[in-house]
Structure formats: structure tokens, C-alpha cells
Amino acid sequence: MTNLRKTHPLMKIINSSFIDLPAPSNISSWWNFGSLLGVCLIIQILTGLFLAMHYTSDTMTAFSSVTHICRDVNYGWLIRYLHANGASMFFICLFLHVGRGLYYGSYMYLETWNIGVLLLFAVMATAFMGYVLP
């Protein structure tokens, strides 16, 4: 009798994606940081959009708009703290992801490594524009 998870069309997709995943047997927790970067980036984008809905950049009203977010907006304090701590978590995951690549010798794949370096520079430039300059 054949196994249902290998014959049923829907279960076959789930089986090949989750159960019989074509991954090396020596994969470790260091390989999770790429997906954690994606989660952190999605959190940053969503919380940044919600904060931008209520923030004003005028020098006279900027502080009062931040207090408005924390006091008057439903869960505004949580959105603000998620955005602030999400940025720190993003960079921690980013540096651990790069460190894993250095440790395992991923710099030998020049095209992939150079694209990663360009993305790192773009992230650092974006962080500079959004954090240091305002």
C-alpha cells in the first residue's frame, strides 16, 4: 500500500516542501537568519507605514505627533517599540547572516557574494538616511 502523503496531489506538495525537504543533513540553526531577516523587514515596513500615517515632520509638531502616537493611537506605543526594536533585531540578524557566510566560505561564490555586499551597502545607506539624517 502506498503512502498517502506521496500519492495525493495536495499532500505531495506539502510533503516535498516540509517533510522530504531537499536540504543537507548538516544544516544548522545558522541558516535561519535569512528568513528572520525577511520577517524583520516585513515588520519594519508594516510598522513604518502605520507610524508614517500619524507622524508629522514639522519641527514644531514632531514631538507632539510622537506623543500622539504613544497616547492616542490604539497600540501606538507597541507599534513604535516594535519598529525601534525591529531595526536592532534586523541588524543583529544581518550581521549574523554575513558572519555565517564568512564562516562557511560563501565568499567563494562571487556573484552571490557581490550581490550580498551591494545589498548590505544599500541597507546601511537606507539606515543612514532614515536614522542619522533626520
UniProtKB/Swiss-Prot annotation:
A Pfam family this chain is assigned to: Cytochrome_B
Residues the entry annotates as binding heme b b566: H97
Mode of membrane association: Multi-pass membrane protein
GO cellular component, one term: mitochondrial inner membrane
BP-aspect Gene Ontology terms: mitochondrial electron transport, ubiquinol to cytochrome c
Protein location: Mitochondrion inner membrane
Matching PROSITE patterns: CYTB_NTER (PS51002)
Keyword vocabulary terms for this entry: Electron transport, Heme, Iron, Membrane, Metal-binding, Mitochondrion, Mitochondrion inner membrane, Respiratory chain, Transmembrane, Transmembrane helix, Transport, Ubiquinone
Family matches, as InterPro entries: Cyt_b/b6_N (IPR005797), Cytb/b6-like_sf (IPR027387), Cytochrome_b_N_euk/bac (IPR048259), Di-haem_cyt_TM (IPR016174)
Gene3D superfamilies: Cytochrome Bc1 Complex, Chain C
Residue sites binding heme b b562 per the record: H83
Cofactor binding: number and manner: Binds 2 heme b groups non-covalently.
Superkingdom: Eukaryota
Annotated transmembrane regions: 33-53, 77-98, 113-133
Keyword Metal-binding applies: yes
SUPFAM superfamilies, sorted: Transmembrane di-heme cytochromes
Cofactor list: heme b
Miscellaneous notes: Heme 1 (or BL or b562) is low-potential and absorbs at about 562 nm, and heme 2 (or BH or b566) is high-potential and absorbs at about 566 nm.
Function of the molecule: Component of the ubiquinol-cytochrome c reductase complex (complex III or cytochrome b-c1 complex) that is part of the mitochondrial respiratory chain. The b-c1 complex mediates electron transfer from ubiquinol to cytochrome c. Contributes to the generation of a proton gradient across the mitochondrial membrane that is then used for ATP synthesis.
Family: Belongs to the cytochrome b family.
Subunit text: The cytochrome bc1 complex contains 11 subunits: 3 respiratory subunits (MT-CYB, CYC1 and UQCRFS1), 2 core proteins (UQCRC1 and UQCRC2) and 6 low-molecular weight proteins (UQCRH/QCR6, UQCRB/QCR7, UQCRQ/QCR8, UQCR10/QCR9, UQCR11/QCR10 and a cleavage product of UQCRFS1). This cytochrome bc1 complex then forms a dimer.
Protein name: Cytochrome b
Organism, scientific name: Sorex shinto sadonis
